[in-house]
């Protein structure tokens, strides 16, 4: 999968290109991450990419011209990589607190793309005309504001890359994460058997796979009900999960 990131701080992306699972994916050429600096598309000696806003007000606004040229270059690079450069296969995504909140279901959908062109804003924002002309979607991490779009862009890439086939050591690891099945994840334990006076739940040591699966599902349900009642209210169980819920309810009545 191909990622082009448009940012005035390309050095920040060494974190995701060189470390951890994402770094390994880049090293093994399963993923390509290229950084494009809009300052390279300016024509003045100061390489300015921002100006004061029309109508007055605080702060600066990123200008449309250098960003548009950076996006066009990113599209060219994406096509050379083999991407179908259109909204359906390689969208231009603007990281913005005004965008649609990123979710696990949307991440899974994004794994079907050939690539992404991710636009990282700074200052007060980006000239609206650039957004109207070039941006296919805006994505937010939540109802808060950061100093720029670089960190959200890395979060987006990390979440998508780890869901691609053959990226994780075991693809089932991602399938068992929180939100994947509509519920929070269950607790996990490893050695030692006892820590700070707390022992590993005996059911996990029993070797009885059906009982372990039932225990884990119960923990998911209880955690979701307690910690994220909004998720629980929206939870739509599968046929198999509905059977588990009935079994848990029956066990609780005994």
UniProtKB/Swiss-Prot annotation:
Its main location: cytoplasm. Keywords: Cytoplasm, Methyltransferase, S-adenosyl-L-methionine, Transferase, tRNA processing. One of its GO terms (cellular component) is cytosol. It comes from the Bacteria. GO terms for molecular function: tRNA (guanine(37)-N1)-methyltransferase activity. It is found in: Cytoplasm. It catalyses: guanosine(37) in tRNA + S-adenosyl-L-methionine = N(1)-methylguanosine(37) in tRNA + S-adenosyl-L-homocysteine + H(+). Specifically methylates guanosine-37 in various tRNAs. This is tRNA (guanine-N(1)-)-methyltransferase. It comes from Psychrobacter arcticus (strain DSM 17307 / VKM B-2377 / 273-4).
């Amino acid at each position: 999968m191909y990622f082009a990131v448009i940012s005035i701080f390309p050095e920040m992306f060494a974190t995701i290109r060189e470390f951890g699972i994402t770094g390994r994916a880049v090293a093994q050429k399963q993923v390509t991450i290229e950084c494009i600096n809009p300052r390279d598309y300016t024509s003045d000696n100061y390489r300015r990419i921002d100006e004061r806003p029309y109508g007055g007000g605080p702060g600066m606004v990123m200008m449309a011209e250098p960003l548009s040229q950076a996006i066009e270059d990113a599209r060219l690079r994406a096509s050379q990589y083999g991407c179908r450069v259109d909204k359906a296969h390689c969208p231009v995504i603007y990281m913005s607190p005004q965008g649609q909140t990123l979710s696990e279901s949307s991440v899974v959908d994004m794994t079907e793309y050939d690539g992404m062109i991710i636009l990282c804003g700074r200052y007060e924002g980006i000239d609206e005309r650039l957004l109207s002309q070039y941006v296919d979607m805006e994505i937010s991490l939540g109802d808060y504001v950061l100093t720029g779009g670089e960190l959200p862009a890395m979060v987006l890439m990390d979440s998508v890359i780890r869901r691609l086939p053959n990226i994780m050591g075991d693809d089932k690891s991602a399938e068992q994460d929180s939100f994947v099945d509509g519920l929070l994840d269950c607790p996990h334990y490893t050695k030692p058997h006892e820590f700070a006076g707390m022992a590993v739940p005996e059911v996990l040591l029993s070797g009885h796979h059906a009982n372990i699966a039932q225990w884990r599902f119960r923990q998911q349900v209880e955690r979701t009900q307690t910690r994220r009642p909004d998720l629980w209210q929206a939870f739509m169980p599968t046929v198999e999960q509905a059977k588990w819920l009935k079994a848990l309810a029956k066990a609780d009545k005994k």
